[in-house]
Amino acid sequence: MYELNNFESIKIALASPEKIRQWSKGEVKKPETINYRTLKPEKEGLFCEKIFGPTKDWECHCGKYKRVRYKGVVCDRCGVEVTKSKVRRERMGHIELAAPVSHIWYFKGIPSRMGLLLDMSPRSLEKVLYFAAYIVIDPGETGLTEKQVLTEKEYSEAIEKYGSGSFKAGMGAESVKKLLENIDLEELYKDLRSKLKESTGQKRIRTIRRLEVVDAFKHSGNKPEWMILDVIPVIPPELRPMVQLDGGRFATSDLNDLYRRVINRNNRLKRLLDLGAPDIIVRNEKRMLQEAVDALIDNGRRGKPVTGPGNRPLKSLSDMLKGKQGRFRQNLLGKRVDYSGRSVIVVGPELKFYQCGLPKKMALELFKPFVMKKLVEDNHAHNIKSAKRMVEKVKPEVWDVLEEVIREHPVLLNRAPTLHRLGIQAFEPVLVEGKAIKLHPLVCTAYNADFDGDQMAVHVPLSVEAQAEARFLMLAPNNILAPKDGQPITTPTQDMILGSYYLTIEQEGVQGEGMIFKDHDEMLMAYANKAVHLHARVKVRRKLHPEDKGRLVESTVGRFIFNEEIPQNLGFVDRKKDPYALEVDFLCDKKALGKVIDKCFRKHGNTITAIMLDYIKKTGFRYSTQGAITIAVGDMEVPKEKGELISLAEEKVDKYEKAFRRGLISDEERYEKVIETWSETTEKVTEALMATLGSMNNMFIMAHSGARGSKNQIRQLGGMRGLMANATGKTVEIPIKANFREGLTVLEYFISTHGARKGLADTALRTADSGYLTRRLVDVSQDVIIREIDCGSQEGSNIKALKDGNEVIEELYDRIVGRYTLEEVIHPETGEVMIGKNEMILEDMAEEICALGIESVKIRSALKCQTRHGVCAHCYGRNLATGEAVKVGEAVGIIAAQSIGEPGTQLTMRTFHTGGVAGADITQGLPRVEELFEARKPKGLAIISELSGTVKVVETKKKREVIVTDEHGESNTYTIPYGSRMKVRDGEFVELGDEITDGSVNPHDILRIKDVAGVQNYIIKEVQRVYRLQGVDINDKHIEVIVRQMLNKVKIEEAGDTNLLPGSLETIFKYEEENARTIAAGGEPADGKPVLLGITKASLATESFLSAASFQETTRVLTEAAIKGKEDHLIGLKENVIIGKLIPAGTGLKRYKNIALNTEEVAQEEIEDTIEEIVEENL
């Protein structure tokens, strides 16, 4: 066996017959499996112990040798080696075939590799392989040609004409094998290379395809005849098990059935050959053997699949690898682990931010080995066995030991679906009674958890290293910021916001207004004795230190209480001018709390922020309870103006109806006007309602503070529900005039059910689509890791605010903060350098840049990074989750994929109907994001200008045309289809690639017309537009990482003197290296153009075959990799997970591999140094 961390790469190739025999421990000759009486494997059968090893540890088949002392002895009676039964998982057998058969992957795949090598169509090849036609192997002196396919009739005619010995022709895989053996790869390669220079069109494409296959065989050392099998490997029996069920029957893996068919047919064929049976019978048997082997390798690839009982297709070797239940995704990429449990979660408001409540029973089971070891150490038990018994009987001393064991031993909590890395965090367990896990309310946002029956899983990090990583990297207080936008994700929600808002409200004319207190405690006492109201403005003397005389500060009682544990130097108050004022002297709604937490984190870091968060949680819950803010039907007052507004609208609608009937306006116009009228009316009713509700109305407080509900929902409760959409998403022109306070009529209720159901169906679809999008994004970007500090790139992006027309999608501030500059940023007025070259732009600098009106800044960008297999820290910028520069080893690709995929569920699924004009529906929401990342041609294409120049609009009765003329007098004419909306006016100047009509642009056109930078900016802008429209903030750099992966390939147009093949895709780095090498040798470099690949294509085009195979199209990827003899250098993360190595990111990087922990000595030295320092200071 290989030592896991000792090999650097894994290679895949075709197996030669010699290799298969070398793997094998013996030939399987009989189709028998297990003897039904003795239940022992049959000799020379599919489960034979002589070939595959003993079924019981250290025991041979006949029972002559038992016990471990005979280890390695081969029994002289039954021939079984005495060893562990585990070898039945790794020992292989083989079947010697009586006639060669072709391997279906290489004959039937698209394109057919065998067909390309022999230059035959797959159809004629199939006829030969399945004994329906003859193929000429050696034409001799006859008029036939090599590889000519003859029918039965033509063959007999040729024999009559030329005589039986004059030429050689045959059928089946044997003949194909002879032809493959005859191929001279070197000659064929040279021949195809010269043909390539002359051919064009379809012929050229075919030649390129053949050249690819020939090149693959030539370089990999595979021989073409190995695509034909003389001998078949039999996989170890434990991987195709046979188990006895209760009723004495057996359940067996489908593979055994498939192997049995192969063995039966093979044995029959051997017998027929020995008997010298007639040709036609032998031929039929050979065909059946070929079909049996096909079914074993890939059932259902050709013809009807072989079915088992109940017409279920049998699972072949290929099916074992494919799909979600296949070997890759089920067992290699995700495994079930020990030391884990799951239970329902309940809220634990009394917990500290870094704690979670773990049920006692669960903790005892999870920490069993630790408890047992500790019991022995503390002399409660003599040995491990008795300790185990104690734990199982749950003796009282076990609980005390458990308390000790779990102290400072973090556990991981995970909630499925884990959409981003905050779906798994570490906490210190606190033992609780009952069976439910207790969760801190502030981490719910990150987990997207609520307490309506959600379940969570617990995992125990076992090794010291794992515990250290859990504590330093995954503990909840270390994950305060969300990686997608760097904003705090642990902001209080619901009750906590409500309490904080209620606490910081200011009211006039309430009890105790204007009172003056000597200190904070006196004010609290007055409040406790109901002498002063929580919302009253009072004056309190504040002191900075005990000796300070202090100063009277005016604010409300609630705000004094709120500020108790909030650091007083967050930057809301200028402390130089006013050292005594309250830091948070404003109404605290959701946004304000977010700001407070953000400033606290940037200024004081994790620990202080965690303490402050716990305080806000505690006071929030307390005062939302004391405030007793509830809602009842009475809180919803229907505005008096409502009736009047509705009757006005009805009159308007009647007027439009009459105008339509008289033919003054079209139905389309009438519909638009009716919708507009009702929308306006709904708005007016809402405004009236908001004016009716006072600022102290409970419903208003809940919505205004951001705790729960929105203006829209209040409108439905107390205003009017307004317009609803029907099943197709078109707005129904009959509005719902009532609200929930008044109650709906039957018709109104019926109209509103459409939209409600569509919403539910949408959500379900969206979740699945969003998950699949995330999976593809992760796959394309999983090997993007920060590899170095600075790649030294001199290129970057010129960043402006993202605009769509006049509407700002993303401000300049958001786009530059936390990035490195490419050039110096100069002050526009003074001309001095504000930020040097290659420096990070911090918040205050970014604010200053925006304040000075600087419109564009040149920054380093991941799109232009020169690092291979990843990006460098300077091109990436700040790690949003920590707020500091990103470290080498950070898996930024996966973070990018998660940041884009996780909010995907919030995006809508809708297609926006342009009121039926020209039928151009504009895709929005999730499908639009998918369309962009898959680089598909969008629906509703816009016409774009292929020149920079002046526009002239020509309109005739029949058509509209736009003519663009550039400065050299060249012009392009674009016909505008009827119903399209134009974006340009006569005499306007358009840039290359600008849109002439409304709609979406095909990204491939932008790449063709503009350049790589143009298409990069387009995708970033469009993706940002979709997310920002839904109120989701994602940082540009995440999209940049994905776009970089979509554009890192070049399509070779002309190969020149390089080793590259025309028409093939190569990474930009390989292309540049190969060209540099060729130019240095004095040759002609290759010519290639950049291509934009969708994320699925880009994932499959990755250099790692393991990663691609585990993603999609497993058999196709493996077929290609085997022929090319590909080597996987295990650079990305997936490959290493599959192999079972540590991933090469974070602490799994090579540079951290051989670090030895020398803790005790170092700690001792440090303690001594510290003592010396203290002594010196005090002397």
Swiss-Prot record:
Q: Which Gene3D superfamilies match?
A: 1.10.132.30, 1.10.150.390, 1.10.1790.20, 1.10.40.90, 2.40.40.20, 2.40.50.100, RNA polymerase II, clamp domain (4.10.860.120), RNA polymerase Rpb1, domain 3 (1.10.274.100)
Q: Which residues does the annotation say bind Zn(2+) 2?
A: C791, C865, C872, C875
* Cofactor-binding details, from the entry: Binds 1 Mg(2+) ion per subunit. Binds 2 Zn(2+) ions per subunit.
Which residues of this UniProt protein bind Zn(2+) 1? C60, C62, C75, C78
Q: Which cofactor does it need?
A: Mg(2+); Zn(2+)
Residues annotated for Mg(2+) binding in this entry:
D450, D452, D454
- Gene Ontology cellular component list: DNA-directed RNA polymerase complex
Biological process according to GO: DNA-templated transcription
- Could you tell me the EC number(s) of this protein? 2.7.7.6
Kindly state which keywords UniProt assigns to this record, in alphabetical order.
Answer: DNA-directed RNA polymerase, Magnesium, Metal-binding, Nucleotidyltransferase, Transcription, Transferase, Zinc
Write one Gene Ontology MF term: DNA binding
Record-linked InterPro entries: DNA-dir_RpoC_beta_prime (IPR045867), DNA-dir_RpoC_beta_prime_bact (IPR012754), RNA_pol_asu (IPR000722), RNA_pol_N (IPR006592), RNA_pol_Rpb1_1 (IPR007080), RNA_pol_Rpb1_3 (IPR007066), RNA_pol_Rpb1_3_sf (IPR042102), RNA_pol_Rpb1_4 (IPR007083)
Q: Which reaction does it catalyse?
A: RNA(n) + a ribonucleoside 5'-triphosphate = RNA(n+1) + diphosphate
The record's note on quaternary structure and interaction partners says: The RNAP catalytic core consists of 2 alpha, 1 beta, 1 beta' and 1 omega subunit. When a sigma factor is associated with the core the holoenzyme is formed, which can initiate transcription.
Q: Which family does it belong to?
A: Belongs to the RNA polymerase beta' chain family.
Under PANTHER family, the record lists: DNA-DIRECTED RNA POLYMERASE, DNA-DIRECTED RNA POLYMERASE SUBUNIT BETA
Describe the function of this protein: DNA-dependent RNA polymerase catalyzes the transcription of DNA into RNA using the four ribonucleoside triphosphates as substrates.
Question: Which protein, by its recorded name, is this?
Answer: DNA-directed RNA polymerase subunit beta'
Identify the species of origin: Alkaliphilus oremlandii (strain OhILAs)
